[in-house]
Amino acid sequence: PYTRIDSINPEDLWNWMDKIREQGIDSIAFPHNSNGSNGQMFEMETFYGEPLSKEYAALRMRNEPIVEMTQVKGTSDTHPLLSPNDEWADFEIMSQRIGSIPPAFSFPGGSYVRDAYVRGLMSNQFGTGNPYKFGLIGASDTHVIGAGLREENYWSKIGLVDADPRARGSIPVADEDRDLVPNRGGVSFQEFEQGSYVIGGLENWGASGLAGAWAEENTRESIFNAFRRKETFATSGPRISVRFFGGYDIDQLSFSDENVIKSAYEVGVPMGGDLLEKETDKAPSFLIWAQRDVNGAPLQRVQIIKGSISRADSTPTEEVYDVACSNGLQVDPMTNRCPDNGARVDIETCAISQNTGSAELKVIWTDPDFDKNDSAFYYIRVLENPTCRWSTWDAIRAGYKPREDLHETIQDRAWSSPIWYTPNDAENPPPIRINAERL
């Protein structure tokens, strides 16, 4: 295998992968924990600071067609500083650089997937290809064989270091028990209302995640091919399933047709696919079908995340559309948001509402703000009803209130790989400058 002992430049890894591919050994590399990369994972230059190029984009996408969206050490969808208008952006954020002791802040720009998708559109618009046209998976990143993927059963990532709730910062540590907390390069404590807690990052880890792939059969070859074509999705732990198709005739389909998925493949493209410009101004439509984890919380809503680059002035735009609401509720056309479905969590017991939420949500949606001149990407985010976070479960089981600086509840979720829309002249740069502040 090729390791960082051979080189710390990922481009050298990709070139090595190309060489063994010539020998008949295909492989895929999965970029890992971009949220903690301090902006280095999705830079707008090469490892040595050279400008991006079509050759670089092709090399990277040939070898890294998939990116890890979520795992124990945080979720890499987006950051509140990058998506201030996204009410759900603050989800399992781990803001530290990977391996930093003491913990150092990881710069969000260039560290998160949604931002990378926008950067990729911009790079392509300026004639240097799109090196960030990747699909999505989730992963666990545990070092203990098993994975604590459920909030109510989160138990460890790295064994003895975080196997005890005191060590992972979810319940206070008595003075006489401080020696029982494993020393991992210097343990710090902070006083809160209920006592002294371990701080330093473990409290920001999450019970995540899972990879999903739509493969023709359950074989290594078929699953690998699904990864290669990016027909994949990620979840933050629950076994939510997501279907996502786009096309100009998708709006002619109906969920009452038992062969609707077969028809969607025939008239559209699945997640990971590309839509090209049509001669007409017709906007693309999208078929979305999400099903809950039967052992998890019911579904609350399905959203489409859209990012685009203006052809006229290269301004990036991000939109979050609620497209399907639980319990037969309807999206408010003024706000693009579902009404509150009434789902609540009892923080004393972690009991959740049993009479609200949906087992599945499905919809055919047409982009109301489509501009055929602007490059765009679309991906799905599915939200469950709120549940207790693992740290809250730890606290109530030990007889404490949840630690006050941590979220008491979360909304577990799933994300599809995107579908990209590309106008015919996307690679002919307009005569204006890039908005450098966005980068």
Where are these predicted regions, by residue range?
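Extended, charged catalytic domains and RNA/DNA-binding interfaces, predominantly
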Residues: 1-439
